[in-house]
């Protein structure tokens, strides 16, 4: 365990742990991966006792990615929702997936794809859907949000702690919110 970020890799049959800042505490707990996880959880991240709302377990969850992939847009989302209802499926939670926003770290609708987001959400609610939006902890590096987050110290830093780390994930290069920051 470490309270600071660390890097883990497997090389030549060995597990390599690199903690640029802080220390790593090695503890043996249990004889299975489950037992080790339960011990680590109890010591470092105990369950809060809260669970998602009952709705997440009692109604279908639909996701627009299956229909639209990166082409999330108001017209096709409404067509998808109407087709669910028109084909006799129950409404439930409708998650609008990646690419509804202008860019990562910005939570405004793309106006070229969503001319009336409030109207769309109102229509989805009228059909009986609860609406969720896909978000991720990434921020486009060349953005106003990135600069503000960097100034506040709200981003994961690189190995030497001198600047925000820019990560290569499946959707390009992004900085990442530091979710360990108590602010």
Give the positions of each predicted feature.
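Short secondary-structure boundary/capping segments
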Residues: 78, 108-113, 147-152
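Carbohydrate-recognition beta-sandwich/jelly-roll modules
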Residues: 1-92, 123, 130
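Proline-rich low-complexity regions
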Residues: 53, 114-115, 137
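Aromatic-lined carbohydrate-recognition surfaces of secreted/lumenal glycan-active proteins
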Residues: 63-66, 95-97, 125, 129-142
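Short amphipathic alpha-helical segments, especially helix-boundary/capping motifs
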Residues: 54-59, 94-98, 164-169
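Alpha-helix-loop-beta-strand connector modules within alpha/beta enzyme cores
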Residues: 117-124
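The substrate-binding groove and active-site-proximal loops of carbohydrate-active enzymes
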Residues: 59-75, 101-115, 168-183
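Active-site-adjacent "subsite" loops/lids of carbohydrate-active enzymes
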Residues: 136-183
